[in-house]
Amino acid sequence: MTISWRALSHFLIPQSDYGEAKTHLEQLQQTLTHLDHPHHHHAHHPHHHLGLYHGALPNTSTITTDSVVSCVSSTLPAVAKAISASSSCDGLQSERKKCPISDLDSGGHGHGQGHGLMEAICAGQKTSPIPPPPPPCCLTLGESSSSPNPIATAALMNASTSGSSSAGGASASLCNDLTRESSWYAHHHHHHHHHHHQLPDELVMYATPTPTPAIGKFGLDTSTEGYLNARYNVNVKGVRHDRTSSFFDIPAVTHPHNHPHPHPHPHPHPYCYRFPSSPPAGILKKSDEEATSAAVYCSDVSSGQHFPHHTKIEHADSTTTAAQQQQQQQEQQQQQQQQQQQQQHQQQLQQAAALHPHHHHSHHGHHGHQQAEQQALTHLTPLHAASAFKFSHTAVISSSAVYATPSHYAHQQQTQSQSVYRDLSPTTLAAVSDADLKYDSGPYNAAISSTYPSALRPNVVDSTTSSDAELRLDQFYASNGISTSSNGQAISQRRGSLQLWQFLVALLDEPTTSASCIAWTGRGMEFKLIEPEEVARRWGLQKNRPAMNYDKLSRSLRYYYEKGIMQKVNGERYVYRFVCDPDALFNMAYGHLTTGSGKGDQHQLTLSLAKTPPTSGDSQTQSPRVAKSEYYDTAALHKY
């Protein structure tokens, strides 16, 4: 609260100062820039506002007002409380001023629609844009302080409305989500106030809540709250403190232009994403409103992006990671889309970086960073996936997509944002950097690729992916004490962390020694336990469980049904089949064994026996790895 209040007051004060300067946006920019330097985070806000006013003045002005108001409101909910508690009438006044100023912007630009709600919120604000509004604003603030959520909601709604004015539907969605999230965001605002202040411009972005729907569209919670909460929890966890440091540490990102960006804001504030008048439906590929929401969300995320990525990075905690992985798996498709977007964004960011090196590149760096982090998390994910499931990469995705989007949004937001959405197509993926590709083909993705329709695989699969996946696998193996490199000693080495399905693959892969007890049926990946008790006995030896029997072993196998690793073949006793690619299967079982040692030949032989020739090596390898990670997930939970 303190920070948010301070940020808010600074924000408001600069705003009030800029109130007069408002007419001179350039001056505002300069002033903001100056302020920016003095008060970094506060500057951000002014800076952002500046960006807002400057870049988005006409359209954004509405957004600005709304976003500012909403930002204020959102911040206010808590901040207002704090303010009222702090008897920061001054702050309120500044806020009022700010409101009027915002109003002036919006009023000046005649963006009343956004202000419809705003008016409701700042009843007097709009009417008497400059001084008169203060009381109403004050009232509003007071009201907000008394009922921060309502106001925050209203403000958010306003923001979304103004922001969404371009997309009325979006605004509605945004409003709802924003409303829902306003309190959340209020928190967020407090925590990330600085950067959220930069968000102010993007308060509309704050609409991010709406994006949740976008996320929901991706299979995440459609409710922004779920997503936001997850993100909030995840992000805030690591980000709150981190955010301050990171956020500020990333001044380039936060105030890309703070840093003597030669052009104050030739590009509207980096985070000043005015949602393109036409919602970048492409990104969310949902409805336009959702697209707008998504855009908002992305934009928001861009600002939020910092913390999200921090969170993820910082907190590549199991929750985040696991959630990321699993949700990523779930949303891999969407994720991929987003990743594509993200990648595109990254590309665009890169391009933008060229355009706006600082911001961009902070952002971009961040972005890349985040992606890298995410990838890293992804690596971690398998184990954490379960716990993190909630937060899931959805957050990641959205964050990543968001991240990417934001920067890119910010930079190319106006022009490129749409293009980005359009470009989100898989092709973009290809264009995207390896890191992105890896991210796309992250373990979850790979796992998904193995488990899910091959259609996904193409996107997921990439040479880079393979290596990425391999890394993950290696990590997995290392974590499980499995030796990926020593193929020959695979089984003995994997003891303890070896999973039953891996053990079965190993047996099937050694027909000379195991043909008597287990063998491929020759129908795809079907295999039969010819001597189930012998298999169970060997498994018991492997796991040092002398009491192991087929009854217990079959229970373990049933666990794999749920995991999508294998299925029971109906109508036949002791006949099971692996659901994933053979290649993926072996890769998962042996790591990179396929490329290494005689086992590779054997494995090929086994594959031929299985009569399921591997599809694309890359895809399969990747899939297996991922699948493996997926499995480990399970394995980590249940080591049979």
From Swiss-Prot:
Ranges annotated as biased composition (Polar residues): 609-624
Gene Ontology CC: nucleus
Transmembrane helix keyword on record: no
Compositional bias (Low complexity): 322-355
Compartments (UniProt record): Nucleus
Residue ranges flagged as DNA-binding region: 498-579
Summary of the function given for this chain in its UniProt record: Required in dopaminergic neurons to regulate expression of genes involved in dopamine signaling. Decreases expression of the dopamine transporter DAT and increases expression of the dopamine transporter Vmat and the tyrosine 3-monooxygenase ple which is involved in dopamine biosynthesis. Also involved in negatively regulating the expression of a group of endoplasmic reticulum proteins, the molecular chaperone Calr and the protein disulfide isomerases CaBP1 and ERp60.
Family: Belongs to the ETS family.
Name of the molecule in the record: ETV5-related protein Ets96B
Species assigned in the record: Drosophila melanogaster
